[in-house]
Amino acid sequence: MPIDDCQHKFEELASEVLPAHFARLTEARKSARDARTFVGHKSATRELLSLLNLTDDFPGCYVFYDGETPVYVGISRTVVKRLSQHLNQDNHYSASLVYKMASEDYPHEMKRDQAMKDEQFRRVFFDVQERLRSMRVAYIEIDNDLEMYLFEVYAAMRLDTATWNTFRTH
């Protein structure tokens, strides 16, 4: 019985489907967008979608690049909305990557909610968010949930983004 309506066997995913998605991501890298394109849009607004030449948000995978270096691989059922959250939101729920990076720059023992109320930490948080805004982002659509989840791990390993990608569960 297929998981999440994925019609491929694991062997086919590993040998054909995921490499094909990676080839599309590699091609998308050539036309990566400035992350600043998403700044000022807290969601996938019509205005933002229009800027991106899209009519609707979409499920898929995205990669932040610092120059030529891949930094982070993410997935979402709503990629444009998720990128907007990373780059605009000021809380650890919606901007979890920014929070994680800021916690590396400003180690602390505080709970997440406490850290977000700490002025020094907030300064570091917004500095990190600004650093993320200076990057470029490439993305591809992946409609099937199982393919999308497997591809996140595949791409993170291929792109060596282990600094910020982790798959450790709670």
List the predicted regions and their residue ranges.
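GIY-YIG nuclease catalytic motif and its immediate N-terminal context
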Residues: 1-81, 85, 89, 146, ...
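Generic preference for hydrophobic/aromatic residues in regular secondary structure cores
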Residues: 8-10, 99-101, 137
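Charged, glycine/proline-rich intrinsically disordered loops and linkers
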Residues: 30-42, 102-121
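Structure-specific nucleic-acid interaction/processing domains
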Residues: 80, 116-170
